[in-house]
């Protein structure tokens, strides 16, 4: 993989990036209380006495949140720590009623793992340092009143997994590939929905620069970036900013910054705190979390087939190209849609599987893009898609007729077989009828017949096109080609 290098006035610079991804755990209730976690609820309608930090209220660990964190750790091949502990991260802010956040600094639930990413067809392993579980904070609302700010505590206490990568990322493209791959795994596992636009997955981006072979530079952290595109843009801008500062004789200050996506730049928020600034100490209200081996085994057995394994199966068993297999398995919903298509064929061979995959990634994806929809909102069902592919495979429809049928399916929602029957779109392989049409075309174009026989082979396509047009696109192309070759060589 070619190194990503930024050129400055004093030479070449390398980017060093580490990502801290905050993923909201899918659970009906919060990490330490029974309050609900539904997105979009009325402000402060999902707040328990624990979330509001009422005196005397003690936290109780939600088993499901722990289970989801363990399953996520297993999915990235990480070490699961049999004993982990909760710590208090002390700071004051209006959206944190307790005055501290319950987190895991010293003994996280998940240890080291890794993620295999693909950038431009080349694979690279990115190390993951840890995953710990912690509480989310509430949300400040500044647009409700001209003179006051309000706080919504619905989000306070919701379980987050903080997934911390090692500083192994070396380009914006690698950062994008890492987040997309991590999001895919979380969705396959079902531990986070990965909706960055809703805030259920967001990234803190740590960026530094250095000359090749030199030690790591001073890093700046860009907080709460909420899209893959913005992560990549923030890294690019911040790296160039740091290079400019250093080359102008300045010094990079360790600080927290925000990314302004409208201006495409980062700006300073505050000086970066270290762990000692938060005065971490073990939470006295929570005992150490001890996980029996049977619990970890149960989590392992509950895991689905993960994207890398599924991709390899598609390549080896279904004969899909690595690219097509990657496109389908990159998204859990797309892979499930494809699997549902294959179920229609009972025991699909490689030819049918390839045809189904190609139709899905070209025809259906193209149509959905035009409609502004995704695979979960497709107007065509997997069964209907499989039926259409099957009609082409058994010769009922030609490729061009299949496209016509597909357009009607998108508009009407009808099954392809019904459309073919009602509109008389069935492909014909009647050699007598096809030969009769071809004879007329050849008779009407004697000059072109002579030119073809004199060596102008490209005219063969002209005769095919004329035949298909004369038969309304319903002639079997293979039969047309066969008869044309016979008559033109006579």
From Swiss-Prot:
One of its GO terms (biological process) is glutaminyl-tRNAGln biosynthesis via transamidation. It catalyses: L-glutamyl-tRNA(Gln) + L-glutamine + ATP + H2O = L-glutaminyl-tRNA(Gln) + L-glutamate + ADP + phosphate + H(+); L-aspartyl-tRNA(Asn) + L-glutamine + ATP + H2O = L-asparaginyl-tRNA(Asn) + L-glutamate + ADP + phosphate + 2 H(+). Allows the formation of correctly charged Asn-tRNA(Asn) or Gln-tRNA(Gln) through the transamidation of misacylated Asp-tRNA(Asn) or Glu-tRNA(Gln) in organisms which lack either or both of asparaginyl-tRNA or glutaminyl-tRNA synthetases. The reaction takes place in the presence of glutamine and ATP through an activated phospho-Asp-tRNA(Asn) or phospho-Glu-tRNA(Gln). The gene is gatB. Its EC number is 6.3.5.-. Heterotrimer of A, B and C subunits. Belongs to the GatB/GatE family. GatB subfamily. InterPro entries: Asn/Gln-tRNA_amidoTrfase_suB/E, Asn/Gln-tRNA_Trfase_suB/E_cat, Asn/Gln_amidotransferase, Asn/Gln_tRNA_amidoTrase-B-like, GatB, GatB_C_1, GatB_Yqey_C_2, Gln-tRNA_amidoTrfase_suB_CS. Transmembrane segments: none annotated. This is Aspartyl/glutamyl-tRNA(Asn/Gln) amidotransferase subunit B.
